[in-house]
Each structure stands twice: as C-alpha cells, then as structure tokens.
C-alpha cells in the first residue's frame, strides 16, 4: 500500500484531505458480500481430474476512503477482522476517519508507519480575552461579577505548556445567561459550539452512550471525535444520574476520554 492516513477530526476537515474520486466502505462491503455469494460449477475432465482453479485477482482500488459514519452500517466481522477484509482488495491509498480501536490497532500493527493526523482546532488567545473583557457586560446582561472569574479561568489556555482542558461550571436559574455565555465564548474564538443535552437520555441509554456499546450504537466518545469545535457545552449536566459522573473524571482532569470502542484526548478544550 502506498499511503495510509488515519485522520481524527470532523467530517468537514476530513473531506479536505481526501481525493475527489474514491470508493467507500459501504461500496466495498457490498462488493465483497456479492462475490462471496457467487457459486462456481467445476466439472472434471475425461480423466476425472478437476482443473486447477485460477488464482482470483484482487479488485484494484486506487483510493479507499472510510468516513466515521460508515462503521454503523457494516457487520461486526468487518470491524473485528478489518485487515482480512482489506486483504481482499488491492488498495493503493487508504484514508480512514475516526476509526474504532479495533480497526486502528489492526492498521497500525500492519502499517506502523501510517500517517496519523489530528484536526487542529482554534485556540484561545490573549486577544480573545481582551475582547471578552470589553464586550461581555454588553452581551450577557446582569452578570458583571462573572466576567472576572471567567477571564481568570480561561487565562491558563493562553499558555503554551497548558494542554489540559479548562472546565467551567455555570449554574443558576434559567435565563441568567449560562448557555449564552458558552455560545459567546465559542463565537469569540470563531468556532461552532459542540452541544450535548444530557436531559434527553434515559439511564439505560446514557450508560451505553457514555461507556460504549455495539459499534453501530451512538457514543459520546465518537461524537467528541467527530466534533467541529473545541468549545464543548454539556447542557443540563445535573440531570444525569450521579452514578455517571465518574465517566467524566479523567476527561475533566486530564482531557482523556475512552470507552470500549474509542480513545481520545482533548487538548486546550473549553468544557
């Protein structure tokens, strides 16, 4: 294989690095299944011997592109035996977005020199803090005391050595500017906000969402990998059952989140 690129980031940025012409996972899985169902009738010759079967030529694929939304549409064996599936084709270039651990580990074992790329998100700078200092009182009415605490909390992200996320807890009654403050920070940095409404999930659903389930089920880790922004709003966090709070300890402390299918790090994020 000529090129192997593993990309971690949003679909929008992934689309910028892939070629215009390619074949995707859904297409090749369909072709593989179709070939597997083809029956061949082999007739012996006059001596009763069966002719030797010609070695089947692999299907040539110049550019094989796998987007993160395709994993949910294939069977489990494609994920768990991805390298065996890949071996059915003569692939020149492989581009894969946000692969589950089962796939990425197989690829890196076979191709240890694969090019692993990460999306570069916009970062908070001192100029952003100056703008917040100038505008906040006019954007979020009645929260003058919040501004100073907000600036103090965000300042560490402007330092080069600081890689861990900053975690902010906005609490209080409805309508006082909690959500608007989060949106305002994202707007200042120039990125769309990543928002998850935790009150929408029931306990059983939430456990699967947080800790990971089958590869075709939604998960928080996959949503984080697919995000367009490094500003995260976990709305109505208090509505989640306290037993689930432990899932966020490592994320809030070190910027690391993992479930049974994915592993990721959040650097210089605002949560």
Sequence positions of predicted segments:
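N-terminal accessory segments that target, anchor, or regulate ATP-driven/P-loop NTPase machines
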Residues: 1-119
